């Protein structure tokens, strides 16, 4: 270093005490301490790693030695195949068959004789189902016994079933009112199906409108007829099955009783203008679908009570006339005195004979009625559909 590069120091006097510098000495000492601590820590870590490594090697060596000792104690096994079996000696030739000797007839008869009673072989235990009700019994000497046994089995089975039902019923009753309410009615399931060929099907539940051709009189059974007033189409509404003007025939019975205002008519067959005929077997109804045909009811009141009323009136007038003639100037009339028992008996007899006259229903021709279709009607056997 030249003197030119030396900085100019401020002037000092000899013997003057200056300020000490502590920055350079302090920083160098701190660096030395940190370096020393780092070296010591690094050495300690290396020593720890060396110790752990040596301990792991020692454990592995110990485990391998132990495994070798255990495996060496197992003896070695050798397997040898068994020697093959010696060959079988050759079979000796079969002797020639002996000639068949004929059996004498007496010997054969002796063989076919049945065994003695004492030597009867014991029968095997076989399940006998002849007493079952499902077995077919032929007409023989044992018919009565088989039938009796079958009836006994059936009665026993029925008794067991009834006892089971009674026990279930008693169990429900013993459960109390709440237990009874918790058991609902058991119903069977039903399977759904599809209607076939709805183009030619008049479904059950349809109503045919019809006008009477004949007058109905329930005095005696009779026949009836009506004319269809409205076209009837198939279930899908595409094909005309019963044309307007078709004739329907039916029948009715004289079964009107006191208090009844309708008559039951069964319509049996329909005939279309094209000659198509089909059986209906469906009941008649009113235009709204009510069961039976309503009509005018004649209760025959005067026929039932007219004779008795006339006899009672004649008896009363006769008593009045008799009392008037023989009573003098008295103004009182007693209708309950005097004879006339024979006339009273006649009135009772007349009433007894006429009281049971049934009422009569009348329904005139031309009145509108309905027919409830009670079954599916299939016209596929007479009709067909052609594409346009």
Curated annotation (Swiss-Prot):
Span list, region Disordered: 1-26, 79-102
Composition bias, Pro residues: 81-100
UniProt GO cellular component terms: plasma membrane
Pfam family, one: TrbI
Domain of life: Bacteria
Localization annotation: Cell membrane
Transmembrane segments: 33-53
Keyword Metal-binding (UniProt): no
Keyword set, alphabetical order: Cell membrane, Membrane, Transmembrane, Transmembrane helix, Virulence
Topology class, membrane: Single-pass membrane protein
InterPro entries reported for this sequence: T4SS_VirB10/PtlG (IPR047695), T4SS_VirB10/TraB/TrbI (IPR005498), T4SS_VirB10/TrbI (IPR042217)
Family listed: Belongs to the TrbI/VirB10 family.
Xref: NCBIfam families: T4SS_VirB10
Note: Transcription is turned on at the beginning of the stationary phase of vegetative growth.
Primary role: The virB operon is essential for intracellular survival and is not involved in the invasion process. Constitutes a major determinant of virulence in mice. Virb10 seems to be per se essential for intracellular multiplication within non-professional phagocytes and is essential for pathogenesis in mice.
Protein name: Type IV secretion system protein virB10
Organism: Brucella abortus (strain 2308)
Source organism phylogeny: Bacteria, Pseudomonadati, Pseudomonadota, Alphaproteobacteria, Hyphomicrobiales
């Amino acid at each position: 270093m030249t003197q030119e590069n030396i900085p100019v120091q401020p002037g000092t006097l000899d013997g003057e005490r200056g300020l000490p510098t502590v920055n350079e000495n302090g920083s160098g000492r701190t660096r030395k301490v940190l370096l020393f601590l780092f070296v010591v820590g690094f050495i300690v870590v290396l020593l720890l790693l060396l110790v752990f490594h040596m301990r792991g090697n020692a454990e592995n060596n110990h485990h391998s030695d132990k495994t070798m000792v255990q495996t060496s104690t197992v003896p070695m096994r050798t397997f040898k195949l068994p020697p093959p079996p010696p060959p079988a000696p050759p079979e000796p030739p079969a002797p020639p068959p002996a000639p068949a000797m004929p059996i004498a007839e007496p010997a054969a008869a002796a063989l076919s004789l049945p065994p003695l009673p004492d030597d009867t072989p014991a029968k095997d235990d076989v399940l006998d189902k002849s007493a079952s009700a499902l077995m077919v019994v032929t007409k023989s000497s044992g018919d009565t016994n088989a039938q009796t046994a079958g009836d006994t089995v059936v009665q026993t089975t029925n008794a067991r079933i009834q006892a089971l039902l009674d026990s279930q019923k008693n169990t429900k009753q013993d459960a109390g009112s709440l237990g009874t309410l918790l058991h609902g009615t058991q119903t069977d399931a039903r399977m759904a199906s599809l209607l076939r060929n709805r183009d030619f099907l008049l479904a059950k539940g349809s109503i045919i409108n019809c006008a009477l051709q004949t007058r109905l009189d329930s005095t005696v059974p009779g026949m009836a007829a009506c004319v269809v007033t409205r076209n009837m189409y198939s279930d899908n509404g595409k094909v005309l099955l019963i044309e307007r003007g078709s004739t329907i025939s039916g029948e009715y019975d004289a079964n009107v009783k006191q208090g009844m205002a309708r008559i039951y008519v069964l319509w049996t067959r329909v005939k279309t203008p094209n000659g198509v005929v089909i059986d209906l077997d469906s009941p008649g109804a009113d235009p709204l679908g009510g069961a039976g045909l309503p009509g005018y009811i004649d209760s025959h009141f005067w026929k039932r009570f007219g004779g008795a009323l006339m006899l009672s009136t004649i008896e009363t007038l006769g008593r009045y006339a008799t009392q008037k003639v023989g009573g003098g100037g008295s103004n009182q009339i007693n209708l309950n005195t005097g004879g006339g028992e024979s006339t009273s008996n006649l009135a009772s007899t007349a009433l007894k004979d006429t009281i049971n006259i049934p009422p009569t229903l009348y329904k005139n021709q031309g009145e509108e009625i309905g027919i409830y279709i009670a079954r599916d009607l299939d016209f596929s056997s007479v009709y067909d559909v052609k594409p346009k």
